[in-house]
Amino acid sequence: MAHLKKNTRGAVPGLAVHFERKTDHHTNKEIDVSKTYLNQDLMADGSDMLSRFNARLNDVYCMKRDDVKALATWIVTLPEELTEAPYEQQSAFFEATTNFLNDRYGQENAVAAVVHYDETTPHLHYAFVPVVFDDKKSRDKVSAKEVLTRHDLQTFHE
């Protein structure tokens, strides 16, 4: 199962806290802190989600408005047939999913790929800045509307 959400700039710090488990006081009661050590950061490059997000926004044009959807997040849950599979096999599924999403939306636009094993169902949080090339202005720009079209969503599971 996969779920997409478009987020404004204002939502990014809160998402980063959740994705990277930067607090000990979780509002989500489903989080089992004894399993948090199992979580995986598939973008372990030494920086955090917020830094990667801000760095990518500095590289592309983004309108300075509060309502601009500057970040898109996919949540991909582990398929039922893999729930009893070994950790390594589950991990391989999430790595393959991350590679698929990087190919689809551009690895340079990815700002987070975190697997949570400490909640009820293991799942991947994949966050990226939706970027397209603006032919009129000859530059990259943020546009969730142009990246995440109905056609993109319809062909996602193919």
Task: Locate each region found by the language model.
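N-terminal nicking endonuclease/strand-transfer module with a His-rich metal-binding environment
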Residues: 1-158
